[in-house]
Regions:
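Short functional hotspots at interaction and active-site rims
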Residues: 1-129
Length: 129
């Protein structure tokens, strides 16, 4: 999630260190400027594999961690809250494919609302110097 946009990938399993590296590679293909990634403390984010991958980028990607147990500081939590309440309320997909396609479609639609993305950052009260 940038201040005006967000990037996502859907995986058919729980996110582990390998998926984090795949997603970082995906970001690097789409964003041509250095990145600051603000992460929660998911163990995969702090794994050796992810650390080695980040080290191989020679400072192109910097990371900061949110304090433990502070979902209110994570703008992604506000994105998910909005998504569940306003984009997919009462959705009952017939199968995993239908769920995946519905998620992809609604997340892409949210990308076209930069003011809303900006509001998620403001709600989180994160300060950038």
């Amino acid at each position: 999630m940038t201040l005006w946009n967000f990037y996502f990938q859907l995986f058919d399993k729980a996110i582990a260190k390998e998926e984090v590296v795949v997603f970082l590679s995906y970001l690097l293909q789409r964003i041509s400027s250095p990145l600051l990634i603000v992460w929660d403390r998911l163990p995969a984010h702090k794994s050796r594999l992810v650390g080695e991958f980040l080290d191989s980028l020679n400072g192109w990607v910097a990371t900061e961690y949110l304090p433990p147990y502070a979902p209110e500081l994570n703008p992604v939590e506000y994105l998910w809250g909005h998504w569940k309440q306003h984009e997919l309320p009462n959705v009952c997909p017939k199968d995993l494919w239908q769920l995946s396609e519905g998620a992809r479609r609604t997340l892409r639609r949210l990308r076209r609302r930069p003011c809303l993305i900006s509001a998620f950052w403001k709600q989180s009260s994160l300060a950038f110097d």
